[in-house]
Amino acid sequence: ALDNPIFGVGMNNFYNNYFYYSTHWDGLNHAVHSTWFGVLAESGFLGLSLFICLITTTFIAAWKLLKNTDLSKLSPGMRVAVNAAPAGIVGFVVSGTFLTQGFIWPVYLQIALVIALQR
């Protein structure tokens, strides 16, 4: 991130650049094993800032939805979805610390779910 602080090394290029930045080369490229460092390496500080804003905004929206919705008026399935939305974001944040999942579809489905629930 320090060599390419604004835009990073580019999307899906962490693996290809591992050799250049690794202090210990064992002949294999490795995964970053952190969503946060993966996004930082591939999209720079600008991309990481936007990603954190996206996740934070989604969590706030999900939390407000949970607190401001009269759950008794919802169908059982919708009630479960409204209750699960903030938990899903928290689960992503925690697991994202140990897994590289910033550019795979489940987190974006979670964001879409929160947007759909608001409507």
Language model regions located:
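Alpha-helix N-cap/helix-start motif
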Residues: 29, 48-49, 102-106
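Hydrophobic alpha-helix feature that most strongly marks membrane-spanning transmembrane helices
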Residues: 2, 6, 19, 54-67, ...
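Hydrophobic transmembrane alpha-helices and their immediate junctions
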Residues: 43-88, 113-114
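Long extracytoplasmic/lumenal interhelical loops at the membrane interface
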Residues: 2-43, 64-73, 84
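Short amphipathic alpha-helical segments
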Residues: 13, 31, 35, 57, ...
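Transmembrane alpha-helices of multi-pass inner-membrane enzymes
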Residues: 87-119
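Gly/Ser/Thr-rich beta-alpha loop segments that engage phosphate groups in nucleotides
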Residues: 10-14, 46-49, 93, 98
